Amino acid sequence: MPESNLTKKALAQTLKDLIHTQSFEKIGVNDICDACQVSRKTFYYHFRDKYALAEWIFDTEIIALLQKCDLEDRWATIQALCRYFYDNRVFYAGLMQFQGQNSFRYHFAEFLFSAVEKFLLPERREICAAADFGGVTPETAQAFYSRSIADAVLLAMYRWLRGGE
């Protein structure tokens, strides 16, 4: 494994460890660097900020997980994703608390939107029927459907991570 990936993984694990004791909002790049025993220069060589590090963690771990899944078996894939989030719930609960510019919620919402577009859309004829009924184009109906499902999953995930409200 290239040294660059080892450094990224070390920074990632450090952030995951720190979020167990501090809120994401209060964790600074200095905290990550001190705990990981690397310089700020090293951190900024790999990531533009802590938000980019959090997104990298999500992206690399989700990609690795999805590569192991049979994507044709939707329920098994969903089950694997649920297990991943359960195993990493403290980390993601910490990330989901932060709202605002560069928030993980936005990145996660975009991931969900893409996932719905690829794996959970109804058949084309159903989208066309909904579009006809609503007086919109099929593309508009598809985007509305995808965004609605993605937003519902995001809200359910947020509530679950906050303690099951």
Give a label for each model feature.
Residues 80-83, 101-133, 140-155:
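Amphipathic alpha-helical packing segments from all-alpha helical-bundle domains
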Residues 11, 30-35, 43, 85:
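Append "Primarily bacterial transcriptional regulators
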Residues 68-69, 92-95, 123, 127, ...:
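Secondary-structure edge/capping motif, primarily at the C-terminal ends of alpha-helices
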Residues 20-24, 37-54:
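HTH DNA-binding helix-turn interface
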Residues 67-94:
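Hydrophobic alpha-helical connector segments
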Residues 60-64, 88, 92, 115-123:
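A short secondary-structure junction motif
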Residues 28-29, 57-65, 71:
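Short, basic, alpha-helical segments at the C-terminal edge of helix-turn-helix-like DNA-binding modules
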Residues 1-22, 26, 31:
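Basic, helix-initiating cap at the start of DNA-binding domains
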